[in-house]
Design a protein with these regions (language model features):
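Redox-cofactor binding/interface segments in oxidoreductases and associated redox assembly factors
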Residues: 68-69, 108, 194-195
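Glycine-rich Rossmann-fold phosphate-binding loop(s) that bind the pyrophosphate
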Residues: 110-112
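Generic hydrophobic/aromatic pocket-lining and core-packing "Φ" positions
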Residues: 119-120
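FAD-site-proximal beta/loop scaffold in flavoenzymes
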Residues: 73, 78, 83-100, 188, ...
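Conserved N-terminal glycine-rich FAD pyrophosphate-binding loop of Rossmann-like flavoproteins
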Residues: 1-15, 141-150
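N-terminal Rossmann-fold NAD(P) dinucleotide-binding loop
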Residues: 115-116
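A Rossmann-like FAD-binding core segment of flavoenzymes
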Residues: 22-63, 124-221, 228, 261-269
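Conserved FAD-binding subdomain of flavin-dependent enzymes
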Residues: 5-33
Length: 269
């Protein structure tokens, strides 16, 4: 479910929201193709885009302008039953799902700023938040660590990793292993938030678009412009701070306006 998108007071299923987006775009004449882009050439004009065989001599499409909105994937633990339990106790977004765990005991996996930020936010709702970290100290900034250590609702399980999910239709707990002594125990929780990072889908743009060290596309301040004139980026592929559906939609609007204005400039006169 998507519970924090404006206009849907009772929430809306993600696929339904996407279907609505698609129908609205098509009503205004957009052509949507479900295909995988395997190669791009942004060093030529018009830009070249390959779908299917990337070794083909001829590109599938050419374009005067391109908007990149390939998103980012949350890193997961890749344990059995994980996919089935996402949305049924397992989440990667505290701001999306935290409210549903009011007065419950939950856990966060990770040790960086993102994990601590998630835990701090979740402590507003949950009765207890356990940060599970495979090392004996956090990687988060000192100010974030100090805030977490001072929060009475946040506890820490050091030198542990999650090895198994307990529950079939909903999460009922996790099995954790001490990475030092190899001993195992069970943590009875109703929610697990995985905060071990995200991977932006930018591999086909490497060597062409300027990327941050973490792989996200660099854009100009207050703009969707990239380092290549005529190429714009929006959504989670360039935003590693907010990562919300509403901010992605807003930046998509920015990119559309930026691209439209750029095209008008190219054809002016």
């Amino acid at each position: 479910d998507v519970e924090n998108y404006p206009g849907f007071p009772s929430g809306i299923m993600g696929p339904e929201l996407m279907s609505n987006f698609r129908a609205q775009a098509e009503r205004f004449g957009a052509e949507l193709l479900t295909k995988k882009v395997t190669r791009v050439n942004l060093h030529t004009s018009p830009f070249e885009v390959w779908v299917g065989d990337p070794s083909s001599n001829e590109p599938t499409f050419t374009a005067e302008s391109i908007i990149v909105s390939t998103g980012a994937k949350a890193l997961m633990l890749n344990l059995p039953k994980e996919i089935e339990l996402v949305g049924h106790g397992i989440s990667t977004c505290a701001t999306c799902d935290g409210f549903f765990f009011k007065d419950q005991e939950i856990a966060v996996v990770g040790g960086g700023d993102s994990a601590v930020e998630e835990a701090m936010f979740l402590s507003r709702f949950a009765s207890k938040v356990t940060i599970i970290h495979r090392r004996d100290q956090l990687r988060a900034s000192k100010i974030m660590q100090d805030r977490a250590f001072a929060n009475p609702k946040i506890k820490f399980l050091w030198n542990h990793q999650v090895t198994e999910y307990i529950g079939d239709t909903k999460l009922e707990g996790v099995k954790v292993q001490n990475v030092t002594h190899q001993t195992e125990s069970v943590l009875n929780i109703s929610g697990l938030f995985i905060a071990i990072g995200h991977t932006p889908n930018t591999s086909i743009f490497e060597g062409q678009l300027s990327l941050h060290e973490n792989g996200y596309i660099k854009t100009e301040s207050d703009s969707s412009r990239t380092n290549i004139d005529g190429v714009f980026a929006c959504g989670d592929v360039q935003d590693f701070t907010y990562r919300q559906a509403i901010t992605a939609a807003g930046s998509g609007c920015m990119a559309a306006i930026d691209a439209e204005r750029w095209l008008e400039e190219q054809h002016a006169g």
